[in-house]
Amino acid sequence: EMIDTCLADFRAFYGEHMMNRTHPYEGIVSVLETLKENGVTVGVLSNKYDSAAKALIEHYFGDLVSITYGERPNIPRKPDPTSVLQLLDELGGDKETTLYIGDSATDMQTAVNAGLTAIGVAWGFRSAEELRASGADALAYEPSDLLPLFEYGVPDVSKAEKALTGYGFGFHYFATKDEAVSYLRDTCAGKSVSMGGSMTMKQLGFP
């Protein structure tokens, strides 16, 4: 009973203040506008309670998002695939042409459980390494990185990674391009570095 009372108080307070210090990541609105212009339908699935999720999406994105599902009574939360499959059905989409984009391990696991292609965004709350380990098929480091995935498809990076590690190369994932540059600078400082040789696309695992 105390938990129910606290939850009701929280929802009442959050309902009045949920826009405080809340704003879209820079570049997201532009990406959504481009997707809409190109006929891509967007839905949102959140573990935030349903009325709040709908209010936030409507306020910040309007008709750029077609459907929003939040937490609903008697419906399991992510990473259970029930809600995302319901959302996909309502949108009239199919698994083969749908990208599930998220910023957490829970999102990646939801995509895997639903049989969808998982795209991890590394500007959120989890590292690129965690997103990849949780099932991300590809990573985006800034919002504009998402657009080529819709236009050209998602490369199977795991094949390239497997091929490269087989040739003695190592893989590191970074949250930002600046982190990658800093890593290379620190690793190579004071060392003589040379590179040579070549690999075919087939050797990298691409057809």
Give residue spans per PLM region.
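Substrate-recognition element of Asp-dependent hydrolases with the DxDx(T/V) motif
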Residues: I28-E58
